[in-house]
């Protein structure tokens, strides 16, 4: 259930998996609030890391098994986390395999 999204307005955020497993990423474009109709989901194959650009809305990563990630995040002053509650929506995302 995608019940919230977060963004980091002051820095990008990278996730490098510490073992070979598949995980899911859910993202929405930059903006004041996530645009529900523009949320996209991606299946990230084993051995691949991801980097969210500054301001990209995303849901915490979902792994197909227990997983640890090396996280590269911004350090410094200022609030670099914005959370938007999505509980008022019922989100159903279709899976369409890449061609």
Describe the residue ranges of each PLM region.
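Conserved metal-binding segment of the jelly-roll/cupin
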Residues: 43-57
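Ligand-binding loop in jelly-roll beta-barrel domains
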Residues: 54-70
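Solvent-exposed, flexible loop/coil residues
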Residues: 46, 61, 65, 87-90
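Residue-level detector of short, conserved catalytic/binding motifs and their immediate flanks
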Residues: 13, 50, 67
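Non-catalytic, conserved peripheral segments adjacent to functional cores
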Residues: 1-41, 73-87, 91-99
């Amino acid at each position: 259930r995608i019940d919230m999204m977060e963004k980091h307005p002051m820095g990008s955020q990278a996730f490098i998996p510490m073992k070979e497993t598949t995980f899911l990423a859910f993202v929405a474009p930059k903006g004041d609030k996530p645009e529900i109709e523009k949320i996209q989901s991606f299946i990230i194959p084993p051995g691949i890391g991801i980097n969210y650009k500054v301001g990209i809305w995303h849901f915490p990563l979902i792994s197909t098994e227990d997983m640890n990630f090396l996280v590269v995040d911004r350090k410094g002053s200022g609030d670099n986390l914005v959370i938007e509650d999505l509980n008022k929506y019922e989100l159903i995302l279709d899976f369409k395999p890449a061609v």
